[in-house]
Amino acid sequence: YKTASRKGEPFEQLIFGWVNPYLPNQDHRICTIELKLRTSKRYMLKTLGIKKWGAAIGIRADEAHRQSKTKDPRITPFYPLIEANITERDVLDYWKKSNFDLRLENPAMGNCTGCFLKSEKTRAWICKNRPKDRDWWLEMEKRANATFIKGVSWKELNDFAQRQGEFSFDD
């Protein structure tokens, strides 16, 4: 916790660590592959010397459609939140009662604030309400001369969001 990156440094190193800068996207989720899957695999194999292991995947019951089979025979995935029927509401209630504040003004935020898998509505909310986060995503696209999402840049989304009035999207 004390040494955790707070400003996207590992992600930025991933983007600009190639011969040509490369932005992760829906077709090539190199962020998941490199920062999660291959990193944990290297740790298990090289650091711990473990040849087969189980992997707890944090997918909730209300997002069970996201489950997938691993192609790696060394890994047995399991989904404890699905098995326990834990939903987003349960998770939010847990964090409200916790002494640790995640500082998520919007439940859809998570730690990858501008993930290309988030809805356009959520990303537009970030443009209006989280300027530091927005600016980081804008800067990555500018430096890489590419976009995370085919057909719409963070700059275009931000320009659109800034032109809009204040609307409440709460139910």
Where are these regions (language model features)?
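Nucleotide-activated chemistry modules centered on ATP-dependent adenylation/adenylyltransferase
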Residues: 1-171
